[in-house]
Amino acid sequence: MTELRDETPLFHKGEIVLCYEPDKSKARVLYTSKVLNVFERRNEHGLRFYEYKIHFQGWRPSYDRCVRATVLLKDTEENRQLQRELAEAAKLQIRGDYSYKGTPDKPSAKKKRGGKAAHVEEPIVVPMDTGHLEAEHEMAPTPRAAGNRTRDNSGGKRKEKPPSGDGRLKGNRGRQTETFYNNAINDVSVYNHVPQEDRIMMRVSERLRELIEYDRNMIKVLGKQHALPARVPIVTIMENFVKQQAVELAISIKQDSSRARNTQSRNARMEREYDRVMSTVCMLKEVVDGLRIYFEFHVDDHLLYTEEKEYVHNYLTDDNMRNCSLILNKSYEYINPSGDTELIGLDGTPVVEGSGDTNGQIGVINIGGPEYEKQLQKCLLYIVTASGKNTAQAYERTSPYTAAYKLPVEMRGFLNETFKWRLLSAESPPEKSMVFGAPHLVRLMIKMPMFLNASPISNKKLEDLLPHLDAFINYLENHREWFDRENFVNSTALPQEDLQRELLDSLDGIAA
């Protein structure tokens, strides 16, 4: 006869678990869930047992329910593999078509569409190697991507199709190798229900993956620490991104609008384009401010390795925070110490500050003075270099430089106002985004799908937001100098000779 005993609790409040589908009439699959509470009960024999109130992440609270431990599994890699196998067996919908975008509002017609597309093989891709970040639980656990598998056994090669209508900007395409990273909690979904966690997926390029792995190795393998405050802090990166996007949008307006055949239609078109640019720039300001708030809220719990925490917390004293704020407010040129400060005319020759003539363009500098000109030059130089050209090609007829100096006075005035914009005012209290730099910001961007999936943001707003996040990630990728070894300081945790030897080995791929 089996001896009756008190049950011991197997899971604790707040723990991430895998829960079997409670409805036995449906496919037997595992859902990523969270233990909201643990209740101690007594059975008819007076023996203790436990029930666990489970929230299926991404589902409405009305789906929360109490279950016994028999339907729960620990969140381990082995059980994640079981979750994927059960999903395969149940023939669940596999997602993975979107770059940093996936919404459950796809029309049913698209889901049912068959024909050739139903027999096209989706390439097997490897999820971004953030297993170091997750499996060791030194950063907040983020499940590995699991849904990027072949849909059948056909041998055809799937053509990659860019998402339509997402307004993605040029500059980060043409990469031969890209990996998918699904930060959604569940990597698969049933046709008749798509959990909130599956709304967003992120495509991570090899360039970004390389930077992330380099950052991880410097911290966890070589015992380095990020120099604080960062040479270019997060608030500065965000400000410069908005200014950069404003210049690119302004130039595109001029190039498109000049094709109109008559003056009246051209003016009407340009007026509409001006309104679009201004509203887009205003939205970008809100986007980066939202990212900054996310960073301030999550940096301690989600964006630091274990090896960093003591160093960071020792640095973030009130005095150091105040000093970072003072430095940023007193020296605005601190935002881009590597930027060119010499003004260049359209003919490639230096322009004397204070001059009102740039290659015959009267009044160009008078709009904003030398500071406007310097900021414009930095943005234009980025456009030229990001397009793969060298600086000598910056003065060709089709160059962005030429278009920038032909902008109407109204748009140049708007750019001047944008260049003066600050994400945080001089009166703002010290923030952590004034201290940390691009590596920690990239960690946030990798986690953003998880945060947004858990947010109540509507799908329509997500569709508007995701192209801007995609452009921001591309902007970070194009500034490798924010991630190089000059941004790290030595640690005494390892012998110096060991650090130097390991550093040389790790820099073979990144230093180029």
UniProtKB/Swiss-Prot annotation:
GO terms for molecular function: chromatin binding; histone H3K36me3 reader activity; histone H4K16ac reader activity; histone reader activity; lncRNA binding; methylated histone binding; RNA binding. Residues 196-500 form the MRG domain. Its main location: nucleus. SUPFAM superfamilies: Chromo domain-like. Changing residue 352 to G: In strain: 5, 7, 399A, 591A, 799A, 852A, 859A, Amherst, Congo13, Congo194, Congo216 and Congo346. It comes from the Eukaryota. The keyword Nucleus applies. It is found in: Nucleus; Chromosome. Residues 11-90 form the Chromo domain. GO terms for cellular component: chromocenter; MSL complex; NuA4 histone acetyltransferase complex; nuclear chromosome; polytene chromosome; X chromosome; X chromosome located dosage compensation complex, transcription activating. Residues 98-175 are annotated as: Disordered. GO terms for biological process: chromatin organization; dosage compensation by hyperactivation of X chromosome; germ cell development; oocyte development; regulation of DNA-templated transcription; regulation of hemocyte proliferation; sex-chromosome dosage compensation. Ubiquitinated by msl-2. Changing residue 412 to C: In strain: 732A. Keywords: Chromatin regulator, Chromosome, Developmental protein, Differentiation, Nucleus, Transcription, Transcription regulation, Ubl conjugation. Changing residue 232 to A: In strain: 399A. Changing residue 310 to K: In strain: 820A. Residues 149-169 have a biased composition (Basic and acidic residues). The chromo domain specifically recognizes and binds histone H3 trimethylated at 'Lys-36' (H3K36me3). The chromo domain also mediates association with roX1 and roX2 non-coding RNAs, promoting recruitment to the male X chromosome. Component of the male-specific lethal (MSL) histone acetyltransferase complex, composed of mof, mle, msl-1, msl-2 and msl-3 proteins, as well as roX1 and roX2 non-coding RNAs. Component of a maternal MSL subcomplex composed of mof, msl-1 and msl-3. Component of the male-specific lethal (MSL) histone acetyltransferase complex, a multiprotein complex essential for elevating transcription of the single X chromosome in the male (X chromosome dosage compensation). The MSL complex specifically associates with the single X chromosome in males and mediates formation of H4K16ac, promoting a two-fold activation of X chromosome. Acts as a histone reader that specifically recognizes and binds histone H3 trimethylated at 'Lys-36' (H3K36me3) and histone H4 monomethylated at 'Lys-20' (H4K20me1). This is Protein male-specific lethal-3. The lineage of its organism: Eukaryota, Metazoa, Ecdysozoa, Arthropoda, Hexapoda.
